[in-house]
Amino acid sequence: MSARRVTLNTRVSRASTSTPVGGASTSSRVGATSPTSPTRTSRQQEKEELQHLNDRLACYIDRMRNLENENSRLTQELNLAQDTVNRETSNLKAVYEKELAAARKLLDETAKEKAKLEIDIKRLWEENDDLKPRLDKKTKEATVAENNARLYENRYNEVNGKYNQSLADRKKFEDQAKELALENERLRRQLDDLRKQLEAETLARVDLENQNQSLREELAFKDQVHTQELTETRSRRQIEISEIDGRLSRQYEAKLQQSLQELRDQYEGQMRINREEIELLYDNEIQNLKAAANRAAQGSALATEEVRLMRTKIDGLNAKLQNLEDTNAGLNARIRELENLLDTERQRHNQYIASLEAELQRMRDEMAHQLQEYQGLMDIKVSLDLEIAAYDKLLCGEERRLNIESPGRPTTDSGISSNGSHLTASASSRSGRVTPSGRRSATPGISGSSAVKRRRTVIDESEDRTLSEYSVNAAAKGDLEIIEADVEGRFIKLHNKGTEEINLTGWQLTRIAGDEELAFKFSRGSKVLGGASVTIWSVDAGTAHDPPNNLVMKKKWPVANSMRSVLANADKEDVASYDRVRANVSSHTSRHRSSGTPSTGFTLGSGAGSTGVRSLFSLLF
């Protein structure tokens, strides 16, 4: 509390001169030469008394005339001063009312703008909250698309590797097919040679079979001829035997039989040897031909089977290669489509992110601009409050000095609460000291006197003013928020902006004020309904305990210049906070005025709006 010192020095000097209007004082001298009678003596005394009374009456009349003239002059001066004061007061009142109306209009516009800004900020926060999930969703979709693109790219690399491997296998199989074709051609030529050999062997076999048949027929013919010759020889020998001695016949027959048997054995042995040789040679040739034919047939069949298998394998590989080429073409088309889609999605996502960032930047710039405008309006309002308060003090002082009855005015609170700021003006006291000093000298004459007055008043005033400003910052993660925390530590108010009921069992509300900290833990069964509020009162607030909307704790909330209120849930996670910081703003005002020509100057110290106060007071006074 700063003191306001007012020093009023009044110096009044008046010089009066007495101008005799008529008559002179006569001294009655009573001669002692003649004897006086009592009647004469009484008459002389009465005459002297009448003369003295006449002199006094003349002085009184002169004094009354002077006083009436002075009174008339003072009345005119007073009327002129009253007219001047009334005119100045009317002008001051008009200017004050005009400035007050403008200030009220500006305050209303500021309140409307503040409400509009709060609505816009809330809408922007809601839009931001709505856009954040969409941004997260789009980011997740972009991440999934990138993962799919990488997956498809990996698949494409695998398919491309398989395709390259298939091309290598195809080239290898083509080389093998060429080698097999050459081998097949060689085997075909070998088969032709074997067929020719088989035909030659078949011809040789036929020739051998014909020779064998010829030899058999020849042998049969010789056997028949031999048998016929034997028969003829027997018949001749029989005839001869019949003619020879029986003994000789028997010897001869025995010898003949032996010779024939030897000859037969010889021929049969020779025939058997020849037959065995022929059969062995034939069998060998046949076996060789069969083996060669089997080898040729097996080689041809193997070559044919290999050619068929190779053709089948080549056809399968060609079909597989065609399928792989078709699959590769489809995958390439799909990859190009996905790449185009991914590029489009990336461009759209980047454009969306850019638009969101531009919108957020625009919103930040707009919020910063609106906050600057609001800060300017708050500064203007503070300066206007200071000007209005100083003007009200000065006007009250002038009204008291001029004994002007002013109509009752509603007192306005100097506290301001707007958009998280609270201003409180500390009451300022003003002490004044009026020191009138004057000098009046008058020389009364017999017939009267005239007086001239000069009055001069010097007033020095100074005023110190201190204002306290509270800046508020509130934040909430869920539906439950802290909407108000009393600066005097009487209560803290919570509000559920959602529609569902919130169970407060295990929740804790902590107040940190300077070095002091106090925690209030909600009891079991505490809750707050949707759209409702709950207030936690200090023990000295004088409020009854009425759950669930009014809760009274056993202690008092601490108070300091910097206060922080934090609401934590049952998991010890902070869900809401409310910060209030106090800042002091001081101002100094000085005023100097004289009674001749009012001249006033004001100087504001560190308070805001000193230029406006100076200009306003220069305009008013």
Swiss-Prot record:
The record marks L281, E345 as: Heptad change of phase. Residues 86-95 are annotated as: Linker 1. GO terms for biological process: chromatin organization; heterochromatin formation; male meiosis cytokinesis; muscle tissue morphogenesis; nuclear envelope organization; nuclear migration; nuclear pore localization; protein localization to nuclear envelope. Residues 258-403 are annotated as: Coil 2. PANTHER family: LAMIN DM0-RELATED (PTHR45721:SF11). Residues 404-621 are annotated as: Tail. GO terms for cellular component: lamin filament; nuclear envelope; nuclear lamina; nuclear periphery; spindle envelope. Residues 1-47 are annotated as: Head. Residues 47-85 are annotated as: Coil 1A. Interacts with MAN1. It comes from Drosophila melanogaster (Fruit fly). Lamins are components of the nuclear lamina, a fibrous layer on the nucleoplasmic side of the inner nuclear membrane, which is thought to provide a framework for the nuclear envelope and may also interact with chromatin. In spermatocytes, regulates cytokinesis during meiosis. Residues 234-257 are annotated as: Linker 2. It comes from the Eukaryota. Belongs to the intermediate filament family. Residues 33-42 have a biased composition (Low complexity). One of its GO terms (molecular function) is structural constituent of cytoskeleton. Residues 1-47, 404-458, 585-605 are annotated as: Disordered. This is Lamin-C. Residues 468-582 form the LTD domain. A motif (Nuclear localization signal) lies at residues 453-458. InterPro entries: IF_rod_dom (IPR039008), Lamin_tail_dom (IPR001322), Lamin_tail_dom_sf (IPR036415). The modification Phosphothreonine is found at T443. Its main location: nucleus. Residues 46-402 form the IF rod domain. The modification Phosphoserine is found at S34, S406, S441. It is found in: Nucleus; Nucleus lamina.
